Amino acid sequence: GGGSPQDTCKAIGIISNNPEFADVRSLEGLSPTNKPSVPILAIPTTAGTAAEVTINYVITDEEKRRKFVCVDPHDIPQVAFIDADMMDGMPPALKAATGVDALTHAIEGYITRGAWALTDALHIKAIEIIAGALRGSVAGDKDAGEEMALGQYVAGMGFSNVGLGLVHGMAHPLGAFYNTPHGVANAILLPHVMRYNADFTGEKYRDIARVMGVK
């Protein structure tokens, strides 16, 4: 499925082998589990979250109207089938929203303080792929859809190692409190956060502009 079904599956997989953490809220932050998840085979149906390759999962506490992140290297699926045909059923609006989520992953991962040479290479390539394919994917172009499937996966491999930034830090409460779709929340916040960070990330923003074809 998309990010939420895959994250739910990852939480269930962890709790199945670590029943002492049956209340998923006890896993918030850096999870203290001792045993790996039951084997998970992930098949993403959206091109955005990269939940199939990341060490974290996001859970919504509907009672408190908040989202919280659990980080656990035990929860990475053992196998991921990334097939763009599985993503064809997305309506254009969902393709746009999940695509912006993937782009935000790549941009935030590229400029985060923990970034290093390997993650920089992954993120800048992901930005290039996504920027070149997102519009075509939304319009229904199958080749562009395949590129989006690849780009979101590459971004996931990067940010899973270094984390994200202020966009996601604000998008989670915005989504939980106002029920704003996650990709839409990212789209609202990304331009403002990039402007806020511009004084400190100018060189990397130039890299981003270059691979996006901005002149």
List each model region and its residues.
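Short, glycine- and charge-enriched coil/turn segments that flank and shape catalytic ligand pockets
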Residues: E20-F21, G136-D143, G213-K215
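Glycine-rich phosphate/pyrophosphate-binding beta-alpha loops
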Residues: G48, Y153-N186
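Buried hydrophobic packing segments
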Residues: T8-G13, A106-I107, I130-A133, Q152-G156, ...
